[in-house]
């Protein structure tokens, strides 16, 4: 608590009562609470005075909304990258933020703002307006922002004359001189661009050899000799463009998750003249493409099965056997087609488990 001897100012000072008898204690007007002892010379607020302060706060809020300047309030904003325009959603629609040169400044309230421009480029002043009728945030006119975005430099309606703002319009001679200077630069740029395009059209010798080798393979649909490729290097763009989408599709397929499922496969080794069957052939889900090859138990050569089928019962043709008389349980180490059934449901390696929790990227 504060000591009674010290004086503390109060934001709502009120004079003392005029009557001597009507002081800080109970009087004829009604029941008044006693003031605190640490604030001598000040009394507490009455109910009516609380209502007046509430009305005053409401009035201040209305004034802050109606007037262009804020009354006892602060404007909040989000800092963005000034080098890059960003679309902002406000009450009047989408607007584009201006660069750092066109921000709210004390000079903006006087009527106009001169943004920072590039070296040698004169821009007309822009009129500052409020974002909304009940907002105190100012911004450059929408028409001026659209003109700047489109490359135009025409003044807006609310602007004054260029001479009054301190800027000077370029004379016709200066405009003609500016237009005449960059013409040779554009021609040189066109020549350079044409040279780059011609260089891109002609593939390097390594690419030509690779394309010729790919097209000369026996598995290709339309073989083309390497001599024709050497004679017409410009025609190689078409096959390269056709090969690029295929490579991108293959890369996408490699990035996708491929689940594996178990199928039944027949194997045959021509060298050893051995034929065997396996019920645990890992194939890509939904296809008959074998992912893991099996090795011959004699010559230990990897072979893919010449035929792959789904693991189903031979009689009922189902993944889980529904026959009234089921065959004996299948041995995971030596699976045979006549022993495939659905009785190994809860086993570690079951015939009816088609999906694998292992996936490859």
Curated annotation (Swiss-Prot):
Any one cellular-component term (Gene Ontology): intracellular membraneless organelle
Effect on the protein upon substituting residue 341 to S: In 4CS mutant; abolished binding to the 3'-UTR of maternal mRNAs
Transmembrane region(s): none
SMART domains: zf-3CxxC
Impact reported for residue 161 to D: Mimics phosphorylation state; does not regulate formation of MARDO membraneless compartment
Tissue occurrence: Ovary. Expressed in primary oocytes (from primary through antral follicle stages) and during the progression from Meiosis I to Meiosis II. The mRNA is detected in growing oocytes (early primary follicle, type 3a) through fully grown oocytes (antral follicle, type 8).
UniProt biased composition (Basic and acidic residues): 168-177
Oligomer status and interactors: Interacts with YBX2.
Protein's recorded name: Zygote arrest protein 1
Organism: Mus musculus
